[in-house]
Swiss-Prot record:
Protein name, entry field: Ubiquitin-conjugating enzyme E2 13
Listed EC numbers: 2.3.2.23
Matches recorded under PANTHER family: UBIQUITIN-CONJUGATING ENZYME E2
Keywords: Ligase, Transferase, Ubl conjugation pathway
Pathway: Protein modification; protein ubiquitination
Catalysed reactions, semicolon-separated: S-ubiquitinyl-[E1 ubiquitin-activating enzyme]-L-cysteine + [E2 ubiquitin-conjugating enzyme]-L-cysteine = [E1 ubiquitin-activating enzyme]-L-cysteine + S-ubiquitinyl-[E2 ubiquitin-conjugating enzyme]-L-cysteine
Length: 151
């Protein structure tokens, strides 16, 4: 199977393994090198601090012309991530460019944990609470992190 992988995916995978992003691990699946097991540590300056979040990342056949498919497997209370783990992030949708890489996507998701954006929500109920009672939303996010994101 590895013989069929485009050079770009092989190079990106090698770089991710040799030079990992701080707070993020991304390991290709043994049976499918287009599928990555991702772990992101909750940033220290966020309600997700102390948590470790599991994600799955899949590179479609069209990659890099099409964006990777990424979703959270760990439950998270965040206005830009819905109950199914889907992520509202422009570079995963209309702002995707073949110049971007897996590492850019992972860094952007990590940044989204530090800076939730209730103005562009995917989970409207969470976003509403974030806008009307941010302190309570942060408290809930911390509680969910303790409940669901412990390694």
């Amino acid at each position: 199977m590895a013989g069929q992988l485009p050079r770009r995916i092989i190079k990106e995978t090698q770089r991710l393994l040799a030079d990992p992003v701080p707070g993020i691990s991304a390991n290709p699946d043994e049976s499918n090198a287009r599928y990555f097991h991702v772990m992101i540590a909750g940033p220290d300056d966020s309600p997700f601090a102390g948590g470790v979040f599991k994600l799955e990342l899949f590179l479609p056949e069209e990659y890099p012309m099409a964006a990777p498919k990424v979703r959270f497997m760990t439950k998270i209370y965040h206005p830009n991530i819905d109950k199914l783990g889907r992520i509202c992030l422009d570079i995963l949708k209309d702002k995707w460019s073949p110049a971007l890489q897996i590492r850019t996507v992972l860094l952007s998701i990590q940044a989204l944990l530090s800076a939730p954006n209730p103005e562009d929500p995917l989970a409207t109920d969470v976003a509403e609470q974030w806008k009307t009672n941010e302190a309570e939303a942060i408290k809930t996010a911390k509680q969910w992190t303790m409940n669901y994101a412990q390694a």
